[in-house]
């Protein structure tokens, strides 16, 4: 079993056997600054078969404490759990990261198990194209897909953007999130973010105190561009009045007001501001059902199952007349780096996940309030 060097504290070991009879060691290490769950996959054989190129594969999980609780309509988080895939081929390493999401039926264990099932194929040179057929869209495929992209870019001694022929500005505007609290707390947070340089605020709401919170926030940051995320906590009843309130306060967009199963209520619904699909849009297969209901889709690599499908979704969504938003889960800079090629296509980028961490991965992207610096 592997221990994180220099991390004192309690240690708990769990060993389980995969369906391929490979042993996975799960080591939980509690440290003063961070809590790291590390799962290392070690194949039984790492020697190459004659005439066959071989990769080494590592799969492990991490937990990154947040400096402030992340409070949204569905609850509160105090740490970010991620699963990391490392692929190494001829001395070149590619890394991908995902964030398992319970609301999508995912857990750290289920995502690890999904990835473990395809390790033999990864060892033998699995391609991104073949991966799309082996795993469904979701966190597990995302980690592997991004690791394959990263591996290819590094093999060619290019950045991911160079590999794709995409140019990025040296500074990217990202939304900064205002989490749920009292109207006074949210207004104070909005004012602090604005005063530090954030020009785009993403306000989390549930079904309570909507008017009080939004009026206070707008008064605290009168010049900010504001987008609102209800995290599917609203109902169709009263939606028209809430949309009008947001429009009157100059809100630029409303994200996922209703649960995905209630999307039919948005059919031919007249609304004064754009509505963006988050939980209602995972891949290209969802686009047909969104027509006439949403004007924008939020692309997240953990929903699409990686950059491969995310790029295809962006192209198809724009062709069908949708505007785009780029989002993220609570994550490290590894996950944001993988999503950056999509930035030139989107109207809003919400990439502040790593800014909630008490400590980011090394090396990491450089964030200032409201901006990512490349």
Task: Identify the meaning behind each predicted range.
Residues 10-11, 25, 36, 44, ...:
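Intrinsically disordered, low-complexity polyampholyte segments enriched for Lys and acidic residues
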Residues 203, 208-329, 333-343, 358-367:
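Catalytic core of soluble alpha/beta enzymes
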